[in-house]
Regions:
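Acidic/His-rich structured neighborhood in mature extracellular/periplasmic domains
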Residues: 49-190, 194, 199
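N-terminal mature-domain "stem" immediately C-terminal to a signal peptide or N-terminal signal-anchor/transmembrane
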Residues: 23-83, 267, 299-322
Length: 325
């Protein structure tokens, strides 16, 4: 399995877990008209047509993923090269060669790439999950940002689009709208909580790297932070580990910046999509980033960090220009 696909699968599973805990309604049996309505809405906000979810497949099935990372290392994001992704079918296989590392195993109902089909697994989810999958995956086909930017951007667009679409289609009093609105409104709070959690962990890992605390002391501090987070966010006890938090942070790190763009542009989805198309066109190339920062490999963590940071600065500069007009 390609590394990029593996990490996208893990990211999709992460969002599935949060949606699964929400009260909602099922996807209607007549799902094709709903999908057509979503696609029409997408085009109104500036999306181009995509090759995702254009066919139905009985054979696709759920897709497994498996990631490992040392408990003594806090990854930057799901792209961090320290996370090892494996092509295995079961959790038992995933854990068999973990050798004490954190293990992140799960399955998702769809491949996170262009050409994914609608399957029985996709149609068996709650309405929130269906709308999320369609809009988020279609969003990825609109831009060519690094995942650390694009995952957060496509979450932002998906959440705002889900709320707007459901209000148009169902009305503000409908249970579908209320369930979707409740879910999307919780996301900014959850994002802030994830960022705070990660910063707390990063402080402990920085002390460990400076040799101020031992392995055991680090892991005890980590357990305390994870325990508080699981209680605050109503997650299953023991569900968090370093691969999981790296996945979470991929979606959370730049979300506040991107949401500030949406707010500055009048909370207008079409303007927001158009703005990020312009940023996509003027962003620094990978080669320019490598040259500026004297980085030898685009697979390195230095490159991942630098590329995201340079694009974040491009966004801030472009927004300043756009709001002066």
């Amino acid at each position: 399995m390609k590394r990029g696909l593996a990490v996208r699968l893990a990211g999709l599973a992460l969002l599935a877990a949060t949606i699964a805990g929400c009260t909602g309604v099922r996807v209607p049996k007549a799902w094709e008209p709903l999908l057509e309505e979503v696609r029409a809405f997408e085009q109104r906000i500036g999306f181009r047509k995509t090759a995702t979810f254009v066919e139905f497949s009985e054979e696709q099935g759920r897709i497994p993923f498996c990631g490992h990372v040392s408990r003594l290392y806090l990854p930057y994001s799901y792209e961090d090269p320290a996370i090892l992704w494996y092509d295995v079918a079961t959790e038992r296989e995933c854990r068999a060669h973990a050798d004490g590392a954190d293990v992140y195993f799960g399955t998702v109902e769809v491949l996170g790439e262009s050409g994914a089909a609608v399957s029985p697994e996709v149609l068996a989810v709650q309405l929130q999950r269906f709308l999320y999958l369609v809009i988020h995956e279609d969003c990825h086909e609109q831009f060519e940002f690094p995942y650390g930017i694009e995952e957060a951007l496509c979450n932002l667009i998906a959440y705002k689009a889900m709320a707007a679409f459901s209000e148009e289609k169902y009305g503000a009093q409908a249970r579908e709208y209320i369930a979707i609105q409740r879910y999307t409104s919780r996301e900014s709070e959850r994002t802030r909580a994830i960022r705070t959690l990660y910063e707390q962990l990063a402080g402990h890992y920085a002390r460990y790297e400076r040799k101020e605390i031992s392995d055991d002391a680090l892991l005890k501090e980590r357990a305390r932070v994870f325990g508080r987070a699981e209680r605050a966010l109503a997650w299953k006890r023991g569900s968090l580990n370093n691969v999981g938090i790296a996945n979470e942070m991929t979606y959370s790190r730049h979300y506040p910046l991107l949401e500030s763009v949406y707010d500055a542009l009048g909370r207008d989805l079409a303007r927001t999509v158009a703005f990020f198309r312009r940023v996509d066109a003027i962003k620094p190339s990978q080669g320019e980033v490598m040259k500026e920062h004297d980085i030898a490999s685009k697979d390195s963590l230095d490159f991942i960090r630098s590329y995201e940071a340079d694009i974040a600065r491009t966004i801030e500069t472009a927004l300043a220009g756009a709001t002066r007009r």
